[in-house]
Amino acid sequence: MTVTYAHEPFTDFTEAKNKTAFGESLAFVNTQLGKHYPLVINGEKIETDRKIISINPANKEEIIGYASTADQELAEKAMQAALQAFDSWKKQRPEHRANILFKAAAILRRRKHEFSSYLVKEAGKPWKEADADTAEAIDFLEFYARQMLKLKEGAPVKSRAGEVNQYHYEALGVGIVISPFNFPLAIMAGTAVAAIVTGNTILLKPADAAPVVAAKFVEVMEEAGLPNGVLNYIPGDGAEIGDFLVEHPKTRFVSFTGSRAVGCRIYERAAKVQPGQKWLKRVIAEMGGKDTVLVDKDADLDLAASSIVYSAFGYSGQKCSAGSRAVIHQDVYDEVVEKAVALTKTLTVGNPEDPDTYMGPVIHEASYNKVMKYIEIGKSEGKLLAGGEGDDSKGYFIQPTIFADVDENARLMQEEIFGPVVAICKARDFDHMLEIANNTEYGLTGALLTKNRAHIERAREDFHVGNLYFNRGCTGAIVGYQPFGGFNMSGTDSKAGGPDYLILHMQAKTTSEAF
């Protein structure tokens, strides 16, 4: 009998012992920098000449590690290894597969601060953000293991006299898992193990900006007893091996988290049936958002301001759930904007290794340049009230930036920026607020601050997002508590950490026996 699932507690860094322990882990990780991480194909460690050089976004001179990269020949080798491993892995009992996840969760829990420290160094995450990322990875392992145990018997169906009908789930085959930089442990681990625990084998292509933490997680899965060939680690260029694997006739499904542009490209290419392909490929995609915090006229205004600020600037706005738009009722607009600006100016921006840092850098030069471009656009679309400056002399730092009086159809209100920039718009009334909330091509997260029960119930039906929060910010979904995933161009309507997510990685089979 398994213990009932509960999410992994976050570390309380106000306790001196926790602060000390995390500092010691950071010191240890600093001694591990600059190592080489090979490909892992069928358990074989393969070094290649071409490397991804992972750098610290807070210190461009510091190299976190060197990850070998796969070409198409090695990607094909990984595909063949996964195909061979699938024949035996799919026949393993669900209990056995789940137990490997439980063991991996225990290992990760013991090494929690170590993995969080890698996230500080490689992803530029402040302590609390890094800790939450690692906790979420543990949650995915624990939750999906339990979900597989629930699904192992299939689902009940009716039987008539003289027959026995059964309905059960089978694995799909070989999957391609393409993970993002912004949750390089949690989302990478969650998408990988969801495929694995359901009996599939995978090729894992981690984000170019964060290959080291993915390599460390592969080590954890090996230690937990995962057989060779089930998880094949192949960093590489998206244009070279990404397209190759998405289009491969033996690929059964693609699990992708990232930008709208890349997600649409994958969806289109996966849809084309290749010579020798025996199925229609399944695509599981989460592709970002343009998420809105709504503030009603009777809201708690201090709560509203903090919800706007922390939703916009947590992890430098590099969350698909980030509240990059705020829509405020005209009756309280000036006061909420004033409070949000004042709170923003108290945020500390700096090296994420410092426990007092609230906001670290953006992930890399391309991101820095993109965000700074949008800040320039914002200067012509709204009133700059906070931030607007960047400094890339040592790392990729951008001050938390607020633009007010932005038109609802402006680029700042419509396009995903993925940085510490929030656009604020004034609404005439609640109807107008909802109209603006639904006027983008995305539909991932949203929040409504109000004391009006009728408005809450209306938003529950009419605010068209996959994750809607009332009287809090729009980030911070917890596995098993707030299953995560959105509508429209935010993805394929999958809900990570939810009761039906694993089923996306399986196919149902009906058997009927007459007697």
UniProtKB/Swiss-Prot annotation:
Instruction: Please state the Enzyme Commission number of this protein.
Output: 1.2.1.88
Reaction equation(s) it catalyzes: L-glutamate 5-semialdehyde + NAD(+) + H2O = L-glutamate + NADH + 2 H(+)
Could you say which enzyme class this protein belongs to? Answer: oxidoreductase
Q: Which Gene3D superfamilies match?
A: Aldehyde Dehydrogenase, Chain A, domain 1, Aldehyde Dehydrogenase, Chain A, domain 2
Write one Pfam family the protein is assigned to. Aldedh
The metabolic or biological pathway listed in the UniProt record of this protein is: Amino-acid degradation; L-proline degradation into L-glutamate; L-glutamate from L-proline: step 2/2
Q: Which GO terms describe its molecular function?
A: 1-pyrroline-5-carboxylate dehydrogenase activity
The reply to whether Acetylation figures as a keyword in the UniProt entry is no
Task: Tell me if Coiled coil is a UniProt keyword of this record.
Answer: no
Domain of life, per lineage:
Bacteria
Protein name (Swiss-Prot/TrEMBL): 1-pyrroline-5-carboxylate dehydrogenase
Q: Which organism is it from?
A: Bacillus subtilis (strain 168)
